[in-house]
């Protein structure tokens, strides 16, 4: 990998700002391969150099990928004066490295939300032509039936004339209050709520379970998060690169 400035490498971990790194170097508290760093502007290979600050070894990541179990009541934004955002749920070191949510969940929607600083991956997952699967659990007022499933497969046209791509509705429970799994491959504003409202079945609860190959970790409580594994990152990249077709056509 190309060499980078020491202050940039350390700042990428989110632990210290570049200004703080300069101070730490001046105080002799930064070691590179066991030697005291002479300057914050020194360059080294971030993948092979052993860098420590105050005796703690730091590990370089080109990009960061965080799986969050988003709770209701939190905004899918990096900052918003109207209320708490998903970044407010993260530890301070994750708030300094440019993470942003990949797509948005409504304020009252729960479930899987990916946060990253990898713009290329985010584009692949969100680009309309990619049609990456997103699966949701939904609870509605009103009994869902076969006619609703067929309408989803055919592609619902909303009241404002907006045409939705074919989607999949899998009914889990049909009663006065129904439950279902919905698979869509686009992300229009309030899409699932509007699709079901057009069928006379208003949504009372909505939770995203997966996006592409990435499935919400059942071990994460609402508001908790963890870093993605190397395997999850690899599979997610493949989801964005190779997704194609229509949700109602191949399942």
Walk through the language-model features, giving the residues of each:
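Basic, flexible Lys/Arg- and Gly-enriched helix-loop patches that mediate nucleic-acid binding at interfaces
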Residues: 1-251
